[in-house]
């Protein structure tokens, strides 16, 4: 297996792992996961009742088994950006693609965690500061 195949396999594995774990994503009770999932907990249909009286947070409302979490969506944004930039990393393109996915009206539908929300805020603030500086420089 060459280096490109290893990278492709790692990315594919990350997408599969994200989708396989969605049913118990953010359920922090390993005994409960064992009770509900048994020997094959992967690709469990997300169910809010699984989280009742357990440590964790149900964040998969509207999702079905095999869907991606917001982490999978973030990987998709990164790969789409790399593809659109011919394999080159362009942080400005990635930031734009990230905002198009996760900001209000974006294509991602689902739970937005604090890190994603904070990233959106920092990108907006940075863009506002850049625009303000450009306007001041222009005179």
Predicted regions span which residues?
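Structured, active/binding-site neighborhoods that engage oxygen-rich ligands
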Residues: 1-139
């Amino acid at each position: 297996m060459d280096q490109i195949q290893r990278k492709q396999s790692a990315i594919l594995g990350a997408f599969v792992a994200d989708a396989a774990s969605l049913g118990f994503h953010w359920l922090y009770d390993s005994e409960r996961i064992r009770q509900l999932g048994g020997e094959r907990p992967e690709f469990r249909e997300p169910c809010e009742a699984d989280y009742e009286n357990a440590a964790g947070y149900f964040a998969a409302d509207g999702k079905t088994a095999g869907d991606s979490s917001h982490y999978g969506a973030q990987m998709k944004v990164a790969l789409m950006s790399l593809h659109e930039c011919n394999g080159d990393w362009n942080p400005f393109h990635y930031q734009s693609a990230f905002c198009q996915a996760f900001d209000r009206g974006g294509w991602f539908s689902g739970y937005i965690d604090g890190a994603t929300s904070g990233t959106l805020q920092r990108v907006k603030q940075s863009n506002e500061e850049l625009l303000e500086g450009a306007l001041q420089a222009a005179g």
